Amino acid sequence: DRRHVLERNPNYRGEPYPGEGMPGDKEAGLLADCGKMMPFIDKLVFNAEKEAVPLKAKFIQGYLDVPEIERTEYGVEFALDMADSDRVRKEYTARGFKLPRTVDISNWYVGFNWLDPVVGKGATPEQQVRNRKLRQALSIAIDWEEYSRIFPKKGGETAMGPLPGGLFGSRHGTLAGVNPVTHRIVDGKIVRRSLDEAKALLAEAGYPNGRDEKTGRPLVLNYDYQRVPTPEIKSELDWMVKQFAKLDIQLEIRATDYNQFQDKMRKGTQQVFFWGWLADYPDAENYLFLLYGPNSKARFDGENTANYDNPEYDKRYNMLRLMDDGPAKQKVIDEMVAIVQQDAIWSFGWFPYASGAYQPWVYNGKPSIMIRDMAKYYRIDPAMRVAKQAEWNRPSWWPPLLIVLMLIGAGWGTQRAFRKRERLNARGEVLA
């Protein structure tokens, strides 16, 4: 069905609008309805649009209050349109479109398989040190800040660890949360470590200039990807190849469909891979368990896709599970994050942006992945909606007038030609 209608339940008990929020919510007007009973809307009408172009057009014209309620990428797309065109920026600004943005509580990263002899743990203490330095060098070379500039629809804030902002225990966005392996602080600013530092680590790992110091053979790594390449995906894969090439490392792309990719992950045959995680509850444990040894994907069919196994990390994770939020829990989380930063089991990637798109007559709109019943918070000004729709869609009368004039001209020309033909004699002469 292309149309779904939800109406207010007259027997619903009601629920008060929240009185607390995140920093900045009050200034954004998101707490103005504090204590009022929800929902504020009597009817919700959903129209299914198969194509993105007409959906965007209807929103721009004012015929949609929001493009989609649960999706959080349309705000990013409208913001990019504004950045690409002064005309569009002026139009969207004049119409008062609201495009609030936040950092999503999900992450994307490049992982290294702990079971792999080259990028994994290593069989001997000496090999463990070399493999760790190789992972650290690669983590420096993969420039996630550049990724977000080149692929802004998919990018976000560079991750320094496994925990996105907004969770207890996360230090994302602070100087205390900087990953010392990949970044450093210069004049109060966070900057990525240089390629020279990465190359020095690579040499210490036994691969000077990307070649095995014992055999002289070039280092070739395999990148397992979870989709068959499309033109868009190919550009991302090419970008990743270039990141490894900075260190003179050859990266072979092994892109497959998702079923084959999952099979590799379960068997533990991947080497370097791309993965992500969307939390289902807002707690640090929901991310830190992704690196807990007994959750290994290959060994126990868990969600530890890197098959990471560090006794010091696991010991702290078992402590964390029983702790309430507080200084002691923060200390344990800091220690766990520091362990995985040093081991560089992930190149931590990025936390994507979530951004909604709302008309100026829509109030209390805030993008969220964790909260799915966002519509009950919305408040609408229907009088403003009607006025803006009329203002933005005034009929243009000159096209039909032009058509009428063209028809009159064509009719006059046809009539003149007909009369001239009627006055021709047999020799083609026009009679008076």
Residue locations for each model-derived region?
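Gly/Pro-rich hinge or "lid" segments in bacterial periplasmic/extracellular proteins
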Residues: 1-45, 51-54, 195-196, 200-201, ...
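Extracellular/periplasmic solute-recognition and catalytic clefts
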Residues: 3-5, 32-33, 45-119, 145, ...
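Short, well-ordered beta-strand elements
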Residues: 4-5, 41-47, 217-228, 252
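Extracytoplasmic/peripheral linker and loop segments enriched in polar/acidic and small residues
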Residues: 94-96, 103, 127, 132-136, ...
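Structural transition elements
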Residues: 157-205, 227-236
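Long beta-strand-rich cores associated with HINT superfamily self-processing modules
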Residues: 358-394
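Alpha-helical transmembrane segments
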Residues: 405-420
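Cytoplasmic C-terminal tails of single-pass
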Residues: 422-432
